[in-house]
């Protein structure tokens, strides 16, 4: 178990804790995706599928939605060769959850799977990779499945042209807060580490995971 005083924003538990702040989560999504979000909700996965997905060892870090979009935000610390398959798995989790809640597949919301990586998953040096389903024969044909994958590479923050995104990626890469938004995140992180409830919850989570594995 990593000592509480050593936790940073990029640790899974701390990341999830910070992103439970709706103002921070909303601002992050607006900065990264350049969209306007009116209000965020934090839906719970249907009880019938939560145990199944958790048994697979995969849980959504941050699952939120607004009126017509759903977002899954994941922090990725270790380089994994199956990153693409993980995005597919998370996508299926969100779609099944929405269908179980009674939505017709024709009414599935536009979805964003967002991976914030502390490494370059594709080794192309880009700070940001966007993936949509495309037609190989004619790029103008749009299947309109509403599924978008956004993958950010924090190590390339210096080449990101958008100053807000660059500052956030730099914070992930170096833990150095250089603007008001990353200052706010860093403040929440530092307060959490001296918060007794946070410390108790973190310890309890680690005990549960030790018992499971």
Predicted regions, residues:
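Upstream accessory/linker segments immediately N-terminal to the RecA-like ATPase cores of bacterial MutS
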Residues: 137, 144-158, 162, 167-174
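Short, charged alpha-helical interaction segments and adjacent helix-coil junctions
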Residues: 2-5, 9, 13, 67-76, ...
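Accessory alpha/beta interaction modules
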Residues: 1-148, 158
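Generic structural signal for hydrophobic core residues of well-folded globular domains
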Residues: 18, 32, 155, 172-175, ...
